[in-house]
């Protein structure tokens, strides 16, 4: 459905704008696929959390995700349904951890955040073979700023909010480590198709 919609919309632009080249149309199609894919996944996950009455937690963890992952990088699934499944699992893990995990020793938090900042400084942003990082220094600085912001907020928040921040950062840092040590980078199928057709 997403492929069908993006293809037809991009063809509409092509038919009504003769200035667009084939590559321009493919770029429009790729962008539309990405937007529609992300939007549909957000709506589905939103409905799941609406059903279990955990919308505030979902939105908060979603904000953390979108203020760290685009800067640090992360693992991508090959298919839409694989990504949707992993995304639901990701937010469910955060939900369970947030609600059930007890408060830990202060020293643990200090060590964890120091290691997280160090890993971010050394490895972020993660490499991507299809979309090379051109502004690595800027992204690294922004990654550290984002992480520092959430660490400060962590110490100003109640336990469940702290748990949400902690597990969100942990899952992000784990991805950074995996990508840089094992080379596990799964580019989305539509990324591969688009770049193959435009090279």
Curated annotation (Swiss-Prot):
It is an enzyme of class 3 (hydrolase). GO terms for cellular component: plasma membrane. InterPro entries: AgrB. GO terms for molecular function: peptidase activity. Its EC number is 3.4.-.-. It is found in: Cell membrane. It holds the Pfam family AgrB. Keywords: Cell membrane, Hydrolase, Membrane, Protease, Quorum sensing, Transmembrane, Transmembrane helix. It is a multi-pass membrane protein. GO terms for biological process: proteolysis; quorum sensing. The chain crosses the membrane at residues 43-63, 81-101, 108-128, 139-159, 165-185. Belongs to the AgrB family. May be involved in the proteolytic processing of a quorum sensing system signal molecule precursor. This is Putative AgrB-like protein. It comes from Clostridium beijerinckii. The lineage of its organism: Bacteria, Bacillati, Bacillota, Clostridia, Eubacteriales.
